[in-house]
Swiss-Prot record:
Residues 38-74, 91-114, 383-398 have a biased composition (Basic and acidic residues). Belongs to the SPT2 family. Histone chaperone that stabilizes pre-existing histone tetramers and regulates replication-independent histone exchange on chromatin. Required for normal chromatin refolding in the coding region of transcribed genes, and for the suppression of spurious transcription. Global regulatory protein that plays positive as well as negative regulatory roles in transcription. Residues 19-111, 370-406 form a coiled coil. It is found in: Nucleus. This is Protein spt2. The keyword Transcription applies. The acidic C-terminal domain mediates interaction with histone H3/H4 complexes. GO terms for cellular component: heterochromatin; mitotic spindle; nucleolus; nucleus. Residues 340-406 are annotated as: Important for interaction with histones. Keywords: Activator, Coiled coil, DNA-binding, Nucleus, Repressor, Transcription, Transcription regulation. The gene is spt2. Residues 38-188, 202-330, 383-406 are annotated as: Disordered.
Amino acid sequence: MAGTPSFQKLMALADSQSAQAAVQIEQLRKAQIREKAREITEERNRQRKLQRERELRQKYEEEQRRQQAMEAKRIAASTRQTSERPPLSAEEAKRIREVKEKDRLESKKNERQGKPRSYNELLRQASSAPAVNETSSSGLLQSKDKRSQSPHSPKKPVKNSSSRDQPVRNSGATSTASLPPAGLRAGRGSQISASLAWLKTGGASAAPSNPRQPPPTSNFSNRKARYASNGLVQLQTGPKRDKRSAGEVQDEIMKRRQNSSISQAATPRTVSNSETSYVGSPALKQSKPNSLKSNNTSRKTSASSAITKPKARPHTSRHDEFVVSDDDELNDRVPDVSSEIWKIFGKRKQDYVSRDVFSDEDDMEATGHDVWREEQAAARAARLEDELEEQRERERELAKKRRKNK
């Protein structure tokens, strides 16, 4: 079978297939080698690129650090130049001295004229002033004498000082308000410094034992004299605020009303009885003209006092208001000057004198006439406001037109 043609063909075919396979394998191997070489070259190129970028970044960072260092050096140099003050020239020093001298002269002038000083100036003067003796007034007088005899203290005429110190001599006797002899009187600056020192110590200085001066009447008068002598303003003057509650105030008003009603009920109505008896008897009218004059004068004085200080009338019901009392008839019959004056002004005196000042109804409630008057006043105010607004609007429009025409 070895020499058969079929076997030879098969062997040749196998050889050709193996050669083709070997060629294909070789081609595949070469292709793999080329692919591997290409990948290696790409990796090398990428590494070179990364290295180049790294180097560029390092150079950039170094440049930034160098610029920051230079900027810091420049800022330090500029700040050092600004902090270090250059030496003053002769002209600048002379100008500064002239300004200071001018300020000092102005302060002295203001002190002579007695102008008020600021709070900071007073505090500075008090801090620089000598210590004040708290137990006696001798140390205070000595310090005032030293400050008055110093060459820097301004000289004041004796006339002004005596006129300024005159109200202090009449006021209370305190450590700051007590006056030294004529040779030891100090200026206004020493008085202000002593008063501020007294305020800082809390007012602990004792009053001088002077037998000639009378004892102080009260703490309020002493404090008032002290502030008047030193030119300071006292805070919280006048009566204190009423700290009572609304209930306490109402209770006090009720007590006053009850007391007034009790007093009116206890007093007999002798005036009306005597007046009626006097009017009914004509013989008594002719026999006692002097008593009539005295009664008229006393009645006029009582009526005038009633105008200034009206009394509370007892509470009466509204159904009895139409009844005319004897007092009203008496007041209508007897001519009164004050009533005539009230009539001149278009008012009826009895309506105001007999008003109950403690009545809640009269004081707290408004009548229809009061409401109408308030409405009329509000309408007039609104109308006036509308007219003013319309006038302003017209003026604005005219101004706008003028601007457009220009």
